């Protein structure tokens, strides 16, 4: 955090520096503030936090530092000092409070979101009520609407497809290169080649064939002799034929992949196919044909010996090849109908195996004649008699097609009734018995269109038994198929039924059918089962739909309501419930849109699920023994059921239909039959044997009564939800719009509040430190762990000249003694803010002690500061109470306490405006705490001096790191790292022009002025006071020195009286002594510092000294001064130049009268040979001239 507001105070002293100018400098980095900035500031464009923001920030900043060739040293925080721990405890409390507030805000946000969703739902319902309903409007698909994707294609992506295609092309290219290099390298007879996919083999063989055509001469030389040319041609022809055979074999293999399953299915059904060929139709893009050769079917005996599932699969398929006129009309109107699947075509071929073309023509003529004469009747003649007999034999063996009927089918009595839906596989015959509102029973046999035509042909021969004119055209017409043509005599079928006691029940949901009339209800019919199933009493009935009926929607599920076939039935017997029927209103129901089958009749088809889930029939039975037999009871009146029918000639488009009963009705009619759903989502009805029926039924009834209480709670919740929905019905659209807009505004405000609270609650953990250190090691950058404060460690590195400055935004570093700081290094601006201690000390008059005093007033990590005190007020306080160290704060605290003791006394009129304002401040007890200043002045740091080493970034490990923490791929990581590595590898660097002289712009920036007038006034007054204080100190020091000198002069004044004669004698004796010493030596001249001078010069000098001393004595006696000062006690000897042999000497001697000591004599001389050299040069010049 640093000192609050200190950067604002120092910004006038900072200047902008280009990052390029910092190239090669060693800078310390306080990483702790980076981590805090990343946690609190790094957000996505929606304001939400991202994953690993500290590592992402560190990565980008490292790249920038290294790009400018700066050598950083990262410093991590150590243990916090005691004073800082107290501040951190308070911060932690604020963070915990923000975290709890964030959770509350999240709950409010969720509630607001739910309210908005409820408003949208109600708003949509209101708007839908206002607009006309478009549910019954039939919309045809647009011409350019694509078919829905398969599940595999939905989960696949373009990238995966592209990768697969790329791998395939790489393999192909490798093979082509190897083949082009050496055509004999590829052995098409090898196992490796045969293990390749057929498509790849086909491409390779095709390339080889083309290669042999065009480039054969490159590898096989032409024969030189003409006789061998024919052999050359034959060899090429044989090789070409050899390749063609392999290509045909591969094509057959590819064809087998697409059409081979037809052969397998047909063989599973008991048939035999000699050959199946499938090819694409050239004239159409999406069509293909299947040619089946050598079809042989099983005999009837073989069919009887086969098991039920296989026979039902074979004979339950469609047999009609030629469609009716109505179907032809439909195909003309719908050209986009789905073509028949291979399985359907296979069934057609099997059905028409024994039919002749003449019989087909006759049946076609009879069917067209009947279609023109009696449109309500059923068409006949679409299948030959031989085909019909085959159908009869097949239906004899079908165990799942089993319809119980009696003489009282048309009665529709009030007893228990039974509805059975028979189905074995996707194309098996299925039946649904329906009764309209008048109680007339209708039975619908649900099958494909070709089977309908077959059954209509049989039913037309039995019109006498059950007339079809009894039902009007608007309702469903009944066509009864004679049971003599479909005998069911196999007793093994009934025995197989005995083992199927647990039957799957159907969940029936109430839904309105817009296509049905209001008075019509779909209810089960009421056939009565006899003790034995007779051949002559079995009826198959076909449900036909008229032109007036609209297409329906069918909702289907995997569960169907069923009962057991073992018990024998007798009419007019009471029914009891043996198994509960649970209802699940929230079960997933799939709606399948469909189209009308044709304009005359629509056939509803039921589709079973992939030969696994057989659709059990819904059957009502009456019991003859009320004591031991328990049956399923179905109500007579059931709500209308939505039915949607779709005809598609392919067997994969059959529609499954689920009949649904409303929850409330079944709860009312069967209060004891509710049961929770099973794990499979289906409901199992447990059938009972005759001896065990009473005991097990009683236990089931007890369990159901206990579960009723549990099911009551969800019903109450549903009722409350319905009541809450009814409350919205009286609200108009304008109120809903207003409420929704208010909720939207509240939601946005809660989002912003939550984001702010998350920023406050974010904290730096030790794991973040470890991850950051790992990234630094990968970049090869040194880092150190500070003993306590990272800012103090950076400052000591700067003070000991181990670094050239510090990159940080924490202003605490100035208080620890830093001299150079770079701020806002990673802003988008082109320049970095550079601060020096010398600059703001000269401009603002702030030193380290004053900065610590500002921390007391403004607040920092070690102290809270004084409330409502900013940087300007703090500078005014320091101006009002000057002093050194803590003296200003002690004065301020003393003055404030005095002012608070007598608040009612009239303030001093001499007080300034600042002091009047300072009276309202609130100081904490113990202000100022000297421990704060001690912590700043004497921090715990590591002052050892060592060398730092920088390594080269490890590219591979950095890529792996970015993949693990950021999810980046190799390309994105390289985009950031390659410019950095390129810049680091540069060997030569060039100096910038601003390194030679200062720019004019920089000089203008250095001359920034303080914008605040109050601050400018306070700084000016403070600087003036400092100058005045410095001047007064200097003046006091000078006065003190003068007094000391006067005392010294008085003490030394008595010893300064000396005789003039003594002085003259001393000087003359000194000169004589020097002359006597020099006479004993043979001298011939000298330089500075030598004592050997000429005699003439010595004599002249002595005479000059004596004359000068005599003149001085005469002047002093003439002046008659009674006292001599220390300054006048020195005797000066004037220099007198003496010419002797062209050499001049000058000397000065000073004597100190106070101490009576001799001073060193300074002698300056020229070379004695100076004039002689000049004369010699002149003589030489004359000689040359002569």
UniProtKB/Swiss-Prot annotation:
Sequence motif Nuclear localization signal 2, residues: 1169-1186
Q: What class of enzyme is it?
A: hydrolase
- Where are the stretches annotated Interaction with PCNA? 981-1009
Residues bearing N6-acetyllysine are 8
- Provide ranges: composition bias, Polar residues: 1124-1133
N-domain: annotated segments:
1-78
Q: Which domain of life is it from?
A: Eukaryota
Name the positions where Mg(2+) 2 binds.
810, 812, 861
GO cellular component annotations of the record? chromosome; nucleoplasm; nucleotide-excision repair complex; nucleus; protein-containing complex
Upon changing residue 792 to V, the result is: In XP-G; mild form
Residue positions, PTM Phosphoserine = 384, 705
InterPro entries, per database record = 5-3_exonuclease_C_sf (IPR036279), HhH2 (IPR008918), PIN-like_dom_sf (IPR029060), XPG-I_dom (IPR006086), XPG/Rad2 (IPR006084), XPG/Rad2_eukaryotes (IPR001044), XPG_CS (IPR019974), XPG_DNA_repair_N (IPR006085)
Q: Per the UniProt annotation, how does pH influence activity?
A: Optimum pH is 6.5-7.
- Give the recorded effect for residue 978 to A: Reduced protein stability, two-fold decrease in 15-nt bubble DNA incision activity and smaller decrease in Y DNA incision activity
What mutagenesis or variant effect is reported for residue 28 to D?
Answer: In XP-G; patient cells show a strong DNA repair defect in response to UV light but not in response to oxidative stress; decreased nucleotide-excision repair activity
User: What up-regulates or down-regulates this gene?
Assistant: Induced by replication stress caused by DNA double-strand breaks (DBS).
Q: Which family does it belong to?
A: Belongs to the XPG/RAD2 endonuclease family. XPG subfamily.
Free-text comment about domains:
Both nuclear localization signals 1 and 2 act as a monopartite signal which binds to the high affinity site on KPNA2/importin-alpha. Both the spacer region (also known as the recognition (R) domain) and C-terminal domain are required for stable binding to the DNA repair bubble. However, both domains are dispensable for incision of DNA bubble structures.
Function, as annotated, reads: Single-stranded structure-specific DNA endonuclease involved in DNA excision repair. Makes the 3'incision in DNA nucleotide excision repair (NER). Binds and bends DNA repair bubble substrate and breaks base stacking at the single-strand/double-strand DNA junction of the DNA bubble. Plays a role in base excision repair (BER) by promoting the binding of DNA glycosylase NTHL1 to its substrate and increasing NTHL1 catalytic activity that removes oxidized pyrimidines from DNA.
Pathology linked to this chain's protein: Xeroderma pigmentosum complementation group G: An autosomal recessive pigmentary skin disorder characterized by solar hypersensitivity of the skin, high predisposition for developing cancers on areas exposed to sunlight and, in some cases, neurological abnormalities. The skin develops marked freckling and other pigmentation abnormalities. Some XP-G patients present features of Cockayne syndrome, cachectic dwarfism, pigmentary retinopathy, ataxia, decreased nerve conduction velocities. The phenotype combining xeroderma pigmentosum and Cockayne syndrome traits is referred to as XP-CS complex. Cerebro-oculo-facio-skeletal syndrome 3: A disorder of prenatal onset characterized by microcephaly, congenital cataracts, facial dysmorphism, neurogenic arthrogryposis, growth failure and severe psychomotor retardation. COFS is considered to be part of the nucleotide-excision repair disorders spectrum that include also xeroderma pigmentosum, trichothiodystrophy and Cockayne syndrome.
What's the protein called, per UniProt?
DNA excision repair protein ERCC-5
């Amino acid at each position: 955090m640093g000192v609050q507001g200190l950067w604002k105070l120092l910004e006038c002293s900072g200047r902008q520096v280009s990052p390029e100018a910092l190239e090669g400098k060693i800078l310390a980095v306080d990483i702790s503030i980076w981590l805090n900035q990343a946690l609190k500031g790094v957000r996505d464009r929606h304001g939400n936090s991202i994953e690993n923001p500290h590592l992402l920030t560190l990565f980008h900043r490292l790249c920038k530092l290294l790009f400018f060739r700066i050598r950083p040293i990262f410093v991590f925080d150590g243990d916090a000092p005691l004073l800082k721990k107290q501040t951190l405890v308070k911060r932690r409390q604020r963070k915990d409070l923000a975290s709890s507030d964030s959770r509350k805000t999240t709950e409010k946000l969720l509630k607001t979101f739910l309210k908005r969703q409820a408003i949208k739902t109600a708003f949509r319902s209101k708007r839908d009520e206002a607009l006309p309903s478009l549910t019954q409007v039939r919309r045809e698909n647009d011409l350019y609407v694509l078919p829905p994707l398969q599940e595999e294609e939905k989960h696949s992506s373009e990238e995966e497809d592209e990768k697969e295609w790329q791998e395939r092309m790489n393999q192909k290219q490798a093979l082509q290169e190897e083949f082009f290099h050496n055509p004999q390298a590829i052995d098409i007879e090898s196992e490796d080649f045969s293990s390749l996919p057929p498509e790849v083999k086909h491409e390779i063989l095709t390339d080889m064939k083309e290669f042999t055509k065009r480039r054969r001469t490159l590898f096989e030389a032409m024969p030189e002799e003409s006789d061998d040319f024919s052999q050359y041609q034959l060899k090429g022809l044989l090789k070409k034929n050899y390749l063609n055979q392999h290509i045909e074999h591969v094509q057959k293999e590819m064809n087998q992949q697409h059409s081979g399953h037809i052969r397998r299915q047909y063989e599973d059904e008991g048939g035999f196919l000699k050959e199946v060929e499938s090819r694409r139709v050239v004239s159409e893009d999406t069509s293909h044909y299947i040619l089946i050769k050598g079809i042989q079917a099983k005999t009837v005996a073989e069919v009887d010996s086969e098991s039920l599932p296989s026979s039902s699969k074979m004979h339950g398929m469609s047999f009609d090849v030629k469609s009716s006129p109505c179907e032809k009309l439909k195909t003309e109107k719908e050209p986009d109908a789905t073509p028949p699947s291979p399985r359907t075509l296979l069934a057609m071929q099997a059905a028409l195996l024994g039919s002749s073309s003449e019989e087909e023509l006759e049946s076609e003529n009879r069917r067209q004649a009947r279609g023109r004469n009696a449109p309500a009747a059923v068409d006949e003649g679409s299948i030959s008699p031989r085909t019909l007999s085959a159908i009869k034999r097949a239906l004899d063996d079908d165990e799942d097609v089993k319809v119980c009927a009696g003489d009282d089918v048309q009665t529709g009595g009030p007893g228990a009734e039974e509805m059975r839906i028979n189905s074995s596989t996707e194309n098996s015959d299925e039946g649904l018995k329906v009764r309209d509102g008048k109680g007339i029973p209708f039975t619908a046999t649900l099958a494909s269109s070709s089977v309908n035509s077959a059954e209509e042909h049989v039913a037309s021969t039995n019109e006498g038994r059950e007339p079809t004119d009894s039902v009007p055209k608007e309702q469903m017409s009944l066509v009864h198929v004679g049971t003599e043509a479909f005998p069911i005599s196999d007793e093994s079928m009934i025995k197989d039924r005995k083992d199927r006691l647990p039957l799957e029940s159907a969940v029936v949901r109430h839904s309105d059918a817009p296509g049905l009339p209001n008075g019509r209800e779909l209810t089960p019919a009421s056939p009565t089962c006899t003790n034995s199933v007779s051949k002559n009493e079995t009826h198959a009935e076909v449900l036909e739909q008229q032109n007036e009926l609209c297409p329906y929607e069918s909702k289907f599920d995997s569960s169907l309501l069923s009962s057991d076939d073992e018990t024998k039935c007798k009419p007019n017997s009471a029914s009891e419930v043996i198994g509960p029927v649970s209802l699940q209103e929230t079960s997933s129901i799939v709606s399948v849109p469909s189209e009308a089958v044709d304009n005359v009749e629509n056939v509803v088809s039921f589709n079973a699920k992939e030969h696994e889930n057989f659709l059990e029939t819904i059957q009502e039975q009456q019991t003859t023994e009320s004591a031991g037999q328990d049956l399923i009871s179905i109500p007579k009146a059931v709500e209308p059921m939505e039915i949607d029918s779709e005809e598609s000639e392919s067997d994969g488009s059959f529609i499954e239909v689920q009949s649904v009963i409303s929850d409330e009705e079944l709860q009312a009619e069967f209060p004891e039959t509710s049961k929770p759903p099973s794990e499979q989502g289906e409901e199992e009805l447990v059938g009972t044997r005759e001896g065990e029926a009473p005991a097990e039924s009683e236990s089931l009834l007890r369990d159901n009564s206990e579960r009723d209480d549990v099911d009551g709670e969800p019903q109450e919740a549903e009722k409350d939800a319905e009541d809450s929905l009814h409350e919205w019905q009286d609200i108009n659209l304008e109120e809903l719009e207003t409420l929704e807009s208010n909720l939207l505004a509240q939601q946005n405000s809660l989002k912003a509040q939550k984001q702010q609270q998350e920023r406050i609650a974010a904290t730096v953990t030790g794991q973040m430190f470890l991850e950051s250190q790992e990234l630094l090691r990968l970049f090869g950058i040194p880092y150190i762990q500070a003993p306590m404060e990272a800012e103090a460690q950076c400052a000591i590195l700067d003070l000991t000249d181990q670094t050239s400055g510090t990159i940080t935004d924490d202003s605490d570093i100035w208080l620890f003694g830093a001299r150079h700081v770079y701020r806002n290094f990673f802003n988008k601006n082109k320049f970095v803010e550079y601060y020096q201690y010398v600059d703001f000390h000269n401009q603002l008059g702030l030193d380290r002690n004053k900065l610590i005093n500002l921390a007391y007033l403004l607040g920092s990590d070690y102290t809270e500061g004084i409330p409502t005190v900013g940087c300007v007020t703090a500078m005014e306080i320091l101006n009002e109470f000057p002093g050194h160290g803590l003296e200003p704060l002690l004065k301020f605290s003393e003055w404030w306490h005095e002012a608070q003791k007598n608040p009612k006394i009239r303030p001093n009129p001499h007080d300034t405006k600042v002091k009047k304002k300072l009276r309202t401040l609130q100081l904490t007890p113990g202000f100022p705490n000297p421990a704060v200043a001690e912590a700043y002045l004497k921090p715990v740091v590591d002052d050892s001096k060592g060398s730092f080493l920088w390594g080269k970034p490890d590219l591979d490990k950095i890529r792996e790191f970015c993949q693990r923490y950021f999810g980046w791929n190799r390309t994105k990581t390289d985009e950031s790292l390659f410019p950095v590595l390129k810049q680091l590898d540069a060997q030569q660097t060039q100096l910038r022009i601003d390194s030679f002289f200062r720019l004019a712009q920089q000089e203008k920036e250095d001359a920034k002025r303080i914008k605040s007038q109050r601050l400018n006034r306070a700084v000016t007054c403070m600087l003036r006071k400092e100058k005045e204080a410095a001047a007064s100190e200097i003046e006091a020091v000078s006065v003190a020195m003068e007094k000391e000198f006067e005392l010294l002069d008085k003490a030394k004044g008595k010893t300064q009286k000396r005789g003039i004669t003594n002085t003259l004698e001393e000087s003359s004796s000194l000169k004589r002594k020097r002359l006597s010493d020099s006479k004993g030596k043979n001298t011939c001249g000298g330089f500075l510092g030598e004592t050997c001078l000429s005699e003439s010069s010595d004599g002249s000098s002595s005479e000059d000294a004596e004359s000068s001393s005599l003149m001085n004595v005469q002047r002093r006696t003439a002046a008659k001064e009674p006292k001599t000062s220390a300054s006048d006690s020195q005797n000066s000897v004037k220099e007198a130049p003496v010419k002797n042999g062209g050499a001049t000497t000058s000397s000065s001697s000073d004597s100190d009268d106070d101490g009576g000591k001799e001073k060193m004599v300074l002698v300056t001389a020229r070379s004695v040979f100076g004039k002689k050299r000049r004369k010699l040069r002149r003589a030489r010049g004359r000689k040359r001239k002569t």
